């Protein structure tokens, strides 16, 4: 164990260091789910810009000409509040609050789509309020102010996005394979920067020498010298190489100390299987079934599935007709398949048929692949837009599935993956879903490596299940449908 020189009460320098290190956390945890404080701040600023845009558009247009018809400020302010909230939600839905979104035509298109969605909802909202006029002039001015305001805010945000203001500084304890996993996670889209990898005498170091730092005094002094916000413990062999006294000194000095699995959970929103130990699953908060949350999820499933079926009935009819036309009336419109659900129990899943009727005539289960020849032309469209999944709303109503959860797999795949991947069966602790956290964050899987990566996201969801996370996933699924991400 590494000995720390001069342990005991901190001197004045250490007291000053505590003030320097007392910075806001990079992530805020809401019902277990990590959200970047940067995007929370960005959303709050844009909310204010949108709120002011409608107020300005309304009063500039109507105050001088129709003073007798101008509604009280409180009423218009409340409606502007609703407009701003709807627009921010629409911006989340089209992916405008995600890391690494490039500036360009696609960015502007997303903003225009978000504004189109929000203006439609806001106009309907305005017409439910008596004595409030919302003409084309108000809509035009509000749109202009909103567009200029949001683009200006985003321009400033992107200008400073690469600065240290938006990143927290991480010191990694270790230079082996575990430390290398942090190095591999680094990238321009991440909200952290590694300021050094501390060499504590591990054999078989993987980190290049220029990035290594020696522990010459204490970890507290090194954290201060490197202006680090967080210490990540990533030593390969904790039993022999872990400087417990140093780490405890950092913790007791008010510095943030995090184990490697929790660091990945916070920064990548997944549970890293390569460094996961069973003890973390046991002692880490989460992985709890709460009756109130389960009841809330079931209520959301029933209401959401019923509304989606009612609204989507014309679409489902059109899809069914499209499948029938392409197959020239031969072959079934619906496709039924056994999948594994809650507790490992099998159930019968329904989909619109997107492949040839003889896709698995030999009886061998296969993953879909890129450009799979078994997929029909119309089937490719409904797979890309996820319209083939709509019949699963009936599975949701029957309680076999939820709107949100890990995607259900076939028994053949489950048996194989359970023998290859640790903790694979844990994804069956919750109901399978129509959409899920893995679907938002990873492409369609067609290999064991893909299944492993998706399992890491599924375990994050199982650990942090909440109504809030379900609503976030449902909202962000809109982008997946609009842009056809991950379909094969």
Spans of model-derived segments:
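Short, glycine-rich, amphipathic interfacial segments at transmembrane boundaries or analogous
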Residues: 200-205, 264-265, 270-274, 333-374, ...
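Membrane-cytosol interface motif
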Residues: 111-115, 166-184, 331-355
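C-terminal terminal-structure detector
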Residues: 376, 419-488
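A short, structured surface patch at a secondary-structure boundary
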Residues: 368-431, 473-481
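A hydrophobic, helix-centered structural microdomain
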Residues: 292-358, 395, 472-488
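A solvent-exposed beta-alpha-beta segment
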Residues: 2, 153, 157-270
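Glycine-rich flexible loop motifs, especially short His-Gly-Gly/GGXG/HXGH segments used as catalytic or interaction
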Residues: 22-24, 29, 102, 211, ...
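Signature of alpha-helical transmembrane segments in polytopic membrane proteins
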Residues: 2-165, 297, 488
